[in-house]
């Protein structure tokens, strides 16, 4: 609540972010992965570049710019739910012309975008990807109203329940059944396929005229 001070149990600094995590995971699966973007001239930027490279990710087109790298402050409750506050840092410098100049010198099968860089740069990436038939996955986080017209050109849209509600201007789904309806509504905006992630409740999806729900796996304590 505003004005309230709470005690935490631990503090951890780590490298990550959706794009970096996805790139590293894809590289470990044996896929050829290139990361396009920008990091700052701070120690975090140097670590991000070297860490991604150590996971087998091509960082040739990961530019270094003056200023801080993008940073996220993530608070995690005992239940596992989190809140995230972003400072775009170097991510805000990814603009259309640098994107056109560095966007993958050779064709890719799939291009993954997220809303932590300017919408204009994402639009340039999407047009480039579709020019040779690649599929485009948009992870719309953070949710931004400026992407309303962008949706119709996206092949795969991935959002969580909060982002889904914000994108549609309605409350987040309170159950998997509601999430299926939300996925259908998002599908109506134009993406060919939609996934709404629901944390421990799995994910809802919509594809063509079909929609459904996939439960989450039941696991023991997560170790990493």
How would you label these PLM feature ranges?
Residues 123, 130-213:
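Conserved phosphate/ATP/ADP-binding segment of small-molecule kinases
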């Amino acid at each position: 609540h505003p004005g309230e001070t709470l005690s935490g149990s631990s503090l951890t600094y780590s490298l990550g972010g959706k794009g970096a995590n996805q790139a590293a995971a894809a590289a470990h699966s044996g896929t050829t992965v290139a990361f396009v973007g920008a990091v700052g001239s701070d120690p975090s930027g140097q670590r991000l570049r070297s860490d991604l490279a150590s996971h087998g990710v091509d960082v040739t087109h990961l530019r270094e710019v003056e200023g801080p790298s993008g940073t996220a402050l993530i608070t995690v409750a005992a239940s596992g739910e989190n809140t995230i506050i972003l400072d775009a840092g170097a991510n805000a410098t990814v603009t259309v012309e640098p994107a056109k100049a560095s966007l993958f010198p050779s064709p890719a099968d799939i291009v993954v975008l997220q809303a932590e860089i300017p919408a204009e740069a994402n639009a340039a990436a999407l047009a480039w990807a579709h020019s040779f038939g690649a599929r485009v996955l948009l992870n719309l986080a953070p949710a931004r109203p400026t992407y309303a017209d962008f949706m119709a050109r996206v092949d795969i849209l991935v959002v969580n329940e909060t982002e889904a509600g914000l994108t549609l201007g309605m409350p987040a789904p309170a159950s998997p059944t509601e999430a299926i309806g939300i996925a259908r509504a998002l599908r109506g905006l134009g993406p060919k396929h939609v996934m709404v992630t629901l944390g421990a409740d799995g994910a809802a999806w919509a594809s063509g005229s079909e929609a459904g729900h996939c439960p989450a796996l039941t696991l023991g304590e997560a170790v990493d």
